[in-house]
A protein has these predicted regions:
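His/Asp/Glu-rich metal-coordinating catalytic cores
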Residues: 1-56, 62-219, 223-226
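Metal-dependent phosphodiesterase/nuclease catalytic metal-binding core
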Residues: 18, 134-348
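Short, polar loop motifs at secondary-structure junctions
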Residues: 61-63, 84, 110-111, 239-241, ...
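Short loop/helix-cap segments at secondary-structure boundaries that form the rim of catalytic
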Residues: 69-72, 114-116, 294-299, 363-369
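Short acidic-hydrophobic, aromatic-tinged amphipathic segments that line or gate anion-handling sites
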Residues: 104-111, 258-268, 372-374
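Glycine-centered loop/turn motifs
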Residues: 110-114, 301, 375-381
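Short acidic, glycine/proline-enriched helix-loop-strand junctions
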Residues: 329, 348-349, 363-382
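Hydrophobic, well-ordered secondary-structure elements that form the walls
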Residues: 354
């Protein structure tokens, strides 16, 4: 087995990992960089005659899927069904990709093994800020490899990770593991349950509340929705409501958390009742509708809960301007694994070799078992 991390060995985002045998090869993710727009050159996948059996995507964030259009036309593209549904809605709204690319994507089924020649791939769901994210168990040449994708254990579905590893994965030869947050803090991340608890207090204390969070961060929206006091409006725009309805259709039967029964689509006809009863409204600063409603209630001293990475606010001048003059409370937790979660995965599956990706400090992993720290494009043979 040969492994090539084409990008992501010393940076967060923009990842692509190739796994090959003598006969076959697959690629996990093809992401654009968080800063900059550098294309990746992958012989046999983005240029030249195709020599790749499939590209599989862990989730819909652009730092994992942003370069999907660069993949050769004859190479199959795969992701989970709900990931594809959400991507289609995003693309209809934001025009991220040519629709011909979206039409090429085939959905896979969680826990159902896929075969690409002598490479077997089994996807398993993980908790992440992108709903329906997956990790991949890859079996080839008598070796077992686990590619975590982006994951965490402090979300609503995070408690399922270790039982899944124990029941379906077992010991592996190689762990390709994300390390987004290892350079930020050694503390345990705040859980989505804690976010919901803190939100409940803020919503009880403030009659008018706007929430700024990613429209596709379904767990975060669920955390706030569950905290809305009885008799208070819970609102979003039509795009956000369509996303939530799509999740409800696929995941609502599995958990009432994802049915969003309180959520209503905002309409100007509700303005007077919103003033009377109060509200919690999910907004997208810069969006015309959101901006209008926020300005309409600005003189009533509403609270804005900012629930995204602080770096976005620091770097985005238009976002700063949109929130200028409002009372702001930050309430957020990472969508990525903390050190405790990473350690628990390593302890459970006992890899012989660890290959860190999606990290600026891969050397942190050296405290664990044998760790290979390749550069982008370097070949690792097993």
């Amino acid at each position: 087995m040969k492994i090539i991390v084409h990008r992501g060995t010393h940076q967060i985002g923009g990842c692509a990992t190739e796994i090959r045998t003598n006969q076959n090869g697959i690629i996990i993710d093809a992401g654009s960089e968080l800063e900059g727009n550098t294309l990746m050159s992958i012989p046999g996948a983005t240029e030249g005659k195709s020599n790749c059996d499939a590209v599989l995507f862990t989730h819909y964030h652009v730092d994992h899927i942003g370069l999907i259009e660069s993949i050769n036309d004859d190479i199959p593209l795969l992701m989970s069904e709900l990931t594809l549904d959400i991507l289609k809605l995003q693309n209809n709204r934001q025009k991220l990709f040519n629709t011909k690319i979206i039409d090429r994507i085939t959905p896979f089924v969680t826990a159902r093994t896929l075969s690409f020649g002598d490479i077997k791939v089994t996807p398993f769901m993980v908790d992440h800020s992108a709903f329906d994210s997956h990790m991949f168990l890859i079996e080839a040449d008598g070796k077992k490899l686990l590619h975590t994708g982006d994951f965490r254990t402090h979300g609503f579905r995070g408690k399922g990770l270790l039982p899944t590893l124990k029941k379906y994965i077992g010991d592996v030869d190689v762990l390709i593991c994300e390390g987004t947050t290892v350079n930020r803090s050694t503390k345990k991340s705040k859980s989505e349950f804690e976010i919901s608890t803190e939100a409940r207090k803020l919503l009880a204390e403030n009659k008018y509340v706007f929430i700024v969070c990613a429209s596709t961060n379904i767990d975060r929206i669920a955390a706030f929705c569950s905290a809305v006091p009885r008799g208070r409006y819970c609102l979003c725009d039509l795009y956000q409501k369509t996303l939530l309805d799509t999740v409800n259709e696929k995941a609502g039967l599995l958990s009432s958390l994802y049915t969003f029964p309180k959520m209503l689509t905002y309409s100007p006809a509700l303005d007077e009742k919103m003033k009377q009863q109060g509200f919690c409204m999910f907004v997208r600063p810069g969006n015309y509708l959101s901006s209008r409603v926020m300005e309409q209630f600005k003189d009533k001293d509403p609270l804005v809960i900012y629930s995204m990475w602080q770096g976005y606010l620091e770097k985005n001048v238009s976002l700063q301007n949109a929130l200028s003059g409002f009372r702001i409370e930050e309430l957020h937790t990472s969508g990525h694994a903390d050190l405790e979660a990473i350690h628990s995965v390593i302890t459970e599956i006992k890899p012989k070799v660890i290959i860190p990706i999606h990290t600026e400090m891969p050397e942190v992993f050296k405290k664990y078992l044998e760790t290979k720290l390749p550069c982008d494009g370097e070949e690792i043979f097993l």
